Amino acid sequence: MLEGQIIKALSGFYYVFSEGKVYQCRARGNFRKRNISPLVGDDVEFQIENKTDGYILDVMSRENALVRPPVANIDIAILVFSAVEPDFSTNLADRFLVAIEKEDIKPVICISKMDLASESEKEQIAVYKDIYEAIGYDVFVTNDEPDKEAIKDYISGKTAVIAGQSGVGKSTLLNSLNSDLTLKTAEISNALGRGKHTTRHVELMPIGDGFVADTPGFSSIEWDDLQPETLQFCFPEMEDRRSGCKFRGCMHDNEPNCAVKTAVEANEIAEFRYKHYIQILQELKNRKPRY
């Protein structure tokens, strides 16, 4: 029995990467009875039949999983936003951060296209960078050519996804990370049958000692399962202060003696972050129930 990681799922086959090789595997029939559906990113136990084929015997417990794109065991999410074209939006950034925080995945902010920004725009981005770093987020600021070595070092030994709205430079970042790995990935590319006209599915691509999920279309924000009471846990700077609130169930909105609101008034929490928290909180409260 071998252990490996699913790096692609297509037409009932699961491509498992183990010890430098890729095996085309099927899942055992009892998976359906147990209501288990293997995902890209799953760590699995499998048995080989020959040099290229095998059967998945078991799926290890998951650290986390996204629904769209369907990927499991993600260590970090690289959230790409552009400084300009389109302009950087803290509202959009905070919404992406909430979507990732609620899945217990470490978010990393990457601000692209700095070479196209004016001096005043660069100064404003620097202010935002300081604010997000003070919260505890890692922030990369890149030009047209991303600092791929720094990002590759960051990804090393991890499984990452890249997300962001269209036009912000996700493809540029992904291609720059993958450009010098042609020889390393030749075997995997051949095994997966990648080509110019191959239909794009979620798959993990080796980047140094880590993997990056090539997730076409990962630009939407979903929080159907997020409850108003748990939103504050997606804002680390608020979670750190909630013990100072007078009321145990304080949601930092209309309650008196709120430590979070006091921190906002003292400029210890960015006003725009609190504003976005309240906006999202109201959206969650006003959300129509699903049956």
From Swiss-Prot:
Its EC number is 3.6.1.-. One of its GO terms (cellular component) is cytoplasm. It holds the Pfam family RsgA_N. It comes from the Bacteria. GO terms for molecular function: GTP binding; GTPase activity; metal ion binding; rRNA binding. NCBIfam families: ribosome small subunit-dependent GTPase A. One of several proteins that assist in the late maturation steps of the functional core of the 30S ribosomal subunit. Helps release RbfA from mature subunits. May play a role in the assembly of ribosomal proteins into the subunit. Circularly permuted GTPase that catalyzes slow GTP hydrolysis, GTPase activity is stimulated by the 30S ribosomal subunit. This is Small ribosomal subunit biogenesis GTPase RsgA 1. It comes from Listeria monocytogenes serotype 4b (strain F2365). The lineage of its organism: Bacteria, Bacillati, Bacillota, Bacilli, Bacillales.
